[in-house]
């Protein structure tokens, strides 16, 4: 059983399994209506500053920040910690014991922001996440729906934020079309709004 199945694995199952069954609940890649999708367009060099500003704007944030690579994940987590944020990282270069320890701290809310790769976050089941932040959009729409699906669970609301570069505008439109949901275009909070 798998909540999500990558295309590569699906093709292997079709090749080697006799008459496999697939159970789909709802439309594939359908957007959860309890999640508000917001994107912020920023210059590439301003992505980290935008992330900090958004974390400051939502002081009670309890969420996952998704990055594209292990290296980026660790760098962003290190910067956040250095800048005084309650954060840690989750990626494939950590031992299983380290991952378990980080997840234990995150589940009991001793960590406010978990910076993670898609692979490390597969199957994460954490209650009450308020936000998912995409530090850049994933290549696959299915990855986006998986990321945003970490919040807004069990009838609760959630916010999926994407910090994008102008070159990613087309990806936003593609995701909107596939999940059949329009994103809100966010305006970066001012210093006055944060204080």
Show which residues each predicted segment covers.
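Conserved helicase RecA-like core
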Residues: 1-195
């Amino acid at each position: 059983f798998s909540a999500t199945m990558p295309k590569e694995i699906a093709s292997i199952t079709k090749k080697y399994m006799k008459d496999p069954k697939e159970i789909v609940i709802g439309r594939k890649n359908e957007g959860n209506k309890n999640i508000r999708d917001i994107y912020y367009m920023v210059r590439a060099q301003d992505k980290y500053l935008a992330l900090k500003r958004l974390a400051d704007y939502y002081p009670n944030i309890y969420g996952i920040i998704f990055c594209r690579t292990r290296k980026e994940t660790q760098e962003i987590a290190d910067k956040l910690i250095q800048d005084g944020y309650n954060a840690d990282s989750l990626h494939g270069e950590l031992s299983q014991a380290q991952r378990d320890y980080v997840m234990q701290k995150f589940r009991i809310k001793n960590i406010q922001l978990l910076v993670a790769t898609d692979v490390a976050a597969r199957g994460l089941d954490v209650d009450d996440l308020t936000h998912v932040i995409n530090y850049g959009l994933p290549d696959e729409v299915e990855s986006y729906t998986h990321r945003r699906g970490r919040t807004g669970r069990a009838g609760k609301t959630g916010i999926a934020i994407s910090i994008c570069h102008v070159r990613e505008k087309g990806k936003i439109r593609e995701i909107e079309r596939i999940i059949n949901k329009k994103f809100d275009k966010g305006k970066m909070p001012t210093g006055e709004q944060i204080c």
